[in-house]
From Swiss-Prot:
Protein's UniProt name: ATP synthase gamma chain
The keyword Cytoplasm is annotated on this UniProt entry: no
Alphabetical list of Pfam families matching this protein: ATP-synt
UniProt keyword annotations, A-Z: ATP synthesis, Cell inner membrane, Cell membrane, CF(1), Hydrogen ion transport, Ion transport, Membrane, Transport
Compartments where found: Cell inner membrane
HAMAP family per the UniProt record, alphabetical: ATP_synth_gamma_bact
Bilayer-spanning residue ranges: none
BP GO terms, sorted: proton motive force-driven plasma membrane ATP synthesis
Molecular function (Gene Ontology), one example: proton-transporting ATP synthase activity, rotational mechanism
Cellular component annotations (GO), alphabetically ordered: plasma membrane; proton-transporting ATP synthase complex
Similarity comment: Belongs to the ATPase gamma chain family.
Amino acid sequence: MPSLKDLKNRIASVKATQKITKAMKMVAAAKLRRAQEAAEAARPYSQRMNTVLANIAKAVTDADGAPVLMTGTGKDQVHLLVVCTAERGLCGGFNSQIARFARDHVRKLVAEGKTVKIFTVGKKGYDILRREFASLIVERKELREVKKIGFENADQIGKRIIEMFEAGEFDVCTLFYSEFKSVISQVPTAQQLIPAKAPEAVAEDADHAGAVYEYEPDPAAILDDLIPRNISVQIFRALLENVAGEMGAKMSAMDNATRNAGEMINKLTLSYNRQRQAQITKELIEIISGAEAL
């Protein structure tokens, strides 16, 4: 049984931890609002980019001038998985959820006889995936020093992916991230980047259905510029979704930790009071017994 001094020290230690988790919860809550606004603002732009890309792509489908980023290599053997996670932990199962989703995809592809390569964005994803797939990780990117995610960060990743594709290092590229739904809900998501999604997969706006477009210069030339930018835009959106999801998960995790610390403090305090009461009672009995002996 721990002594009164040990219990007192443990209570003080848990109270100090509770102060830290409560402060971290408040910081995460403040960051969450800004991150959520940024993620929600990026969604319409990225979705519209996909729609525009699909509409232009219709004009060059099966044409000789279609960009290779849209048509692909014609093969489906080598897959590059770009797995985006957070740089830090203390956010519940946020990182492990994305990594587990990507890991299941890797196992499925390997079972089908495909060659898999992994590009990790974020330290935690790398730390988790290297335990099982160290030999498959061909590229890693950490954003630990980046205070605020900007488009230039996503653009660097996008350009590196395109460089790898043009060098013939893979046939298909899929982006993995966590889509922010709410503080308690972040959904692991997979999005194919290369080849660009088939035009029919993105519906044209109902108001413009059947409209005839004229492109200047030709559609293929526009796609040559648009597809690389769209890849960076989709990565940027994924990074923003991840930040919002991370802050939501962190706020929830720190709230749980704060409440658990409170429960532990109550239990330790109760144990301390009982032991102290028993000790006082014992001392009183000893005093009374001594007095009677006299």
